[in-house]
Amino acid sequence: MSYVEQLTPQMLAYSKEFADNGKINWLPYVMYFHPYNHRSSVVNTDSRGFRYSNACGKIYSVGDCSQLNSCRIIAGSSTVFGIGASADCHTLASRMSINDPHTSPWINFGGRSFNSTQEMILFSLNRHLLPEIDEVVLMSGFNDLGLARLPARFRQEHGAFFMGNQFHSAMQSFQETRVSRWVSRRKAVEHDDVPSLEEQISYAVELTRRNLSNWSALCSDMKAPLTFVLQPLANWVRVRGAKEEELLFAEREKLGGFAQHYGDILSQETYETYRDKLAAACDELGISFIDLTSAIQDSISDDLWLFVDRIHFTDEGHDIVARILIEQLAMKKRKS
């Protein structure tokens, strides 16, 4: 039995149904989303594909919250969706609802493998389903940076997206003959230079800033405060993880893992540069900014098992990060 199966058996539920080759739905505008009405002991979704949150014995989701007078939103990608959690009650939205003294629960607005443009569009398309929104937290940052290394023909103006190869290949098959497709691919390969790390960071920051501007306008209209949280990576938090993390990381790397694709992004220098530029962008827009990495570093021991992979949390990790995030949000409010 592999370490992934032994230490994180819940990950099979995600890889079977929620991975790129799982039962995803192709949708207008956001491209793809989670399975509808999915039921399992690990993850459950509503009729629109949003994951349920648990709070005080009740469950809520974007498409199933008519019983609420108000709510709070945590939006983002797979970390917010809760990849790694062994059940819905262990996601960030659930743990924040349980650990937060306020009455309105947190609703999970996470979209697996979304970039910042998709995150913003998802919210704009579905906010009419929600009751009054008291607060919005956008926890994001990695996917824009990771996708920024793709060629310009995939990134274009609004950012590359995961599974973009399938989309572009399908479009080409309709638009080109076999000969012209072969020629165009040869030309594309000749110009597919990988951007420098500096260019990747600049592109990701500008894309995030533009989408944050849209988030700010939406939240201003709703009179809901907005906070941007830079999501942490395992190697940003600490150079060497807990023993369980190191076993999982090593096993995943043998299969062509995270470090192989995003090695330079894992460095402290990249983290600090990216963090500072995003913080400056938030300051320009008047948006509250939280660097979760440094807050976690100040709160955990070296042997604490926090991550199931380099970007997703264990159950205990979700609870710890939720508590830290609540504390950070409270500190921001006291200072404002």
Q: Where would I find each of the regions flagged by the language model?
A:
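Loop/turn elements at helix/coil->beta-strand transitions in domains of secreted/extracellular proteins
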Residues: 102-104, 131-135, 222-227, 285-287
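Short, amphipathic alpha-helical "lid/cap" segments that border enzyme active or binding sites
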Residues: 116, 120, 205, 209, ...
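Short catalytic/ligand-binding loop motif for oxyanion handling, primarily in non-cytosolic enzymes
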Residues: 81-84, 115-117, 144-149, 234-240, ...
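Catalytic His-Asp segment of secreted/periplasmic serine-dependent ester chemistry enzymes
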Residues: 235-332
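N-terminal secretory targeting modules
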Residues: 1-72, 129-132
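Residue-level recognition of beta-strand->loop/alpha-helix junctions
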Residues: 108-110, 230, 291-294
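Serine-esterase "nucleophile elbow" of acetyl-processing enzymes
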Residues: 50-112, 117-132, 137
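Serine-dependent acyl-ester chemistry module
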Residues: 143-277
